[in-house]
Regions:
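Hydrophobic transmembrane alpha-helices
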Residues: 15-57, 61-161
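Interfacial transmembrane-helix boundary/kink motif in multi-pass membrane proteins
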Residues: 1-10, 35-38
Length: 161
């Protein structure tokens, strides 16, 4: 089937694109210890902490039966509608820092932008927001008006006026 073949070939291309930072990092001839290596570890660690904290906060919030049908606004979810995706993106942001000494290092600075486009427009957020609007309706619309979609920012007023 040509459609299935095309689908799987497209996935293979995306896997190759998303693997480039790790490959370039491994090709870096410098020994570990440059300031960019430590910056990469700090950014990656911050992303991991953010993603794990957001997932844990959401899981704890969902366990409370009183929250059924409502939107989580606790913890990081007060500042971003998708703090877990933001944390994941921070982890992707770390890879180009780690690969700066490799031949592809500077080109890989574009990689986090590609990941950001995927999260904001193609894979993560659009699908999640559609499902949230279907399941939580007006509560989620108010949350959308008050809360940044991706980057953690102070909340705006939920009043639509």
């Amino acid at each position: 089937n040509a459609v299935a073949f095309g689908f799987f070939q497209a996935q293979a291309v995306f896997v190759a694109i998303f693997a480039l930072p790790a490959v370039a990092g491994g090709a870096d001839p410098r020994p570990f210890g440059a300031w960019t290596d430590y910056a990469a570890l700090a950014v990656w660690g911050a992303g991991l902490i953010c993603e794990c904290a957001a997932d844990q906060q959401l899981a704890r919030w969902r366990r409370d039966p009183a929250n059924a049908g409502r939107t989580c606004r606790a913890g990081l979810w007060r500042y971003s509608r998708h703090p877990n995706y933001f944390g994941e993106w921070l982890q992707w942001l770390a890879w180009p820092l780690l690969a700066l000494g490799s031949p592809l290092g500077w080109w890989l600075a574009l990689h986090p932008l590609v990941v950001l486009v995927f999260l904001l427009y193609l894979t993560g957020i659009p699908h999640t927001e559609r499902r949230a609007l279907l399941s939580r309706g007006e509560d989620y619309r108010r949350y959308q008006r008050a809360t940044s979609a991706f980057f953690p920012l102070p909340p705006r007023s939920e009043d639509p006026s």
